[in-house]
């Protein structure tokens, strides 16, 4: 018994797969065909494309009921995987060559695109490679017009650029923006620190000049007048107390104190009493009498 050829088996499998459209296409076609929700989603005038008139209500009411989610962006991405194209940019109108009004049988011709993701491993550069400048050839996408790209020797910048060229554009852009923001903040903080250091140096210099210009005399005041000692007692009262003490301590002759009766204090002159016979050219009789007696004894 001869086995069927391999090509015939593959053709049979592919035809059986195409005979049944995917659930996503079937549900979408039924939603567009439903005339009760034409205010949300419907065909265009000639039936060659469908239009989502109200994306908010479509995501709120219809998507959870038929597709188990409420993300309109996910629905649009699903359409893109099946080859649907947006007709006009100002509204949500999508078309496909096999998605026509009244032509449900054509849905089996719509095949989902196979997404092939190529993961490129980023190898950390060695110590020798870090010290050298790396040269990377331009990418195949044609975005770079230069023949060669010279990259920095920094490992972080090399990793960011390599991540950007490998397809993870969103992540690398966010990292670059964050890095740029941190760099600008660092520059601003360094500028403020330099200004604060300058202000501190100016204050220190000003205080040094001020202290050096002051005289060493403590009695000097900025107004130019010397400070006077504080008087706790009146001068007159203090002088009277000194006079009374001196009178009590001085010897007395016939009840009259003899000795120095003149005292001086700061700014105060006390009136003194003259001693009997003081500053007089005439001698008193009793002095003359005792003087003669003394002369006789001495002779």
Swiss-Prot record:
Example of a GO MF term: transcription cis-regulatory region binding
InterPro entries from the UniProt entry: HSF_DNA-bd, WH-like_DNA-bd_sf, WH_DNA-bd_sf
Keywords, ordered alphabetically: DNA-binding, Nucleus, Phosphoprotein, Stress response, Transcription, Transcription regulation
SMART domains linked: HSF
Motif (Nuclear localization signal): 261-264
Sequence segments annotated as region (Disordered): 119-157
GO cellular component: nucleus
Modification after translation: Exhibits temperature-dependent phosphorylation.
DNA-binding region: 21-115
Family per record: Belongs to the HSF family. Class B subfamily.
Name of the featured protein: Heat stress transcription factor B-2a
Organism: Arabidopsis thaliana (Mouse-ear cress)
Gene that this polypeptide is encoded by: HSFB2A
């Amino acid at each position: 018994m001869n086995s069927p050829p391999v090509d015939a088996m593959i053709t049979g499998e592919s035809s059986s797969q195409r005979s049944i459209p995917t659930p996503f296409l079937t549900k979408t076609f039924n939603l567009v065909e439903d005339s009760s929700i034409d205010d949300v989603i419907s065909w265009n005038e000639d039936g060659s494309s469908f239009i989502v008139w109200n994306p908010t209500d479509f995501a709120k009411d219809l998507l959870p009921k038929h597709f188990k989610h409420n993300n309109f962006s996910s629905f649009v991405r699903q359409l893109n995987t099946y080859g649907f194209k947006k007709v006009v940019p100002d509204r949500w109108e999508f078309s496909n060559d096999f998605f026509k009004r009244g032509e449900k049988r054509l849905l089996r011709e719509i095949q989902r695109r196979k997404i092939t993701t190529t993961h490129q491993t980023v190898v950390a550069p060695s110590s020798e490679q870090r010290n050298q400048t790396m040269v990377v050839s331009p990418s195949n996408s044609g975005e770079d017009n230069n023949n060669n790209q010279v990259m920095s020797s920094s490992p972080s910048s090399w990793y960011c650029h390599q991540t950007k060229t490998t397809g993870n554009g969103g992540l690398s852009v966010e990292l670059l923006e964050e890095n740029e923001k941190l760099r600008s903040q660092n520059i601003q903080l360094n500028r403020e620190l330099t200004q604060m250091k300058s202000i501190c140096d100016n204050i220190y210099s000003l205080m040094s000049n001020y202290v050096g210009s002051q005289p060493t005399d403590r009695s000097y005041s900025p107004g130019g007048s010397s400070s006077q000692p504080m008087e706790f007692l009146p001068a007159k009262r203090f002088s009277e107390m000194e006079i009374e003490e001196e009178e009590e301590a001085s010897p007395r002759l016939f009840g009259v104190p003899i000795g120095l009766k003149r005292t001086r204090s700061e700014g105060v002159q006390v009136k003194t009493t003259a001693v009997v016979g003081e500053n007089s050219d005439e001698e008193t009789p009793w002095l003359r009498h005792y003087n003669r007696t003394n002369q006789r004894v001495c002779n």
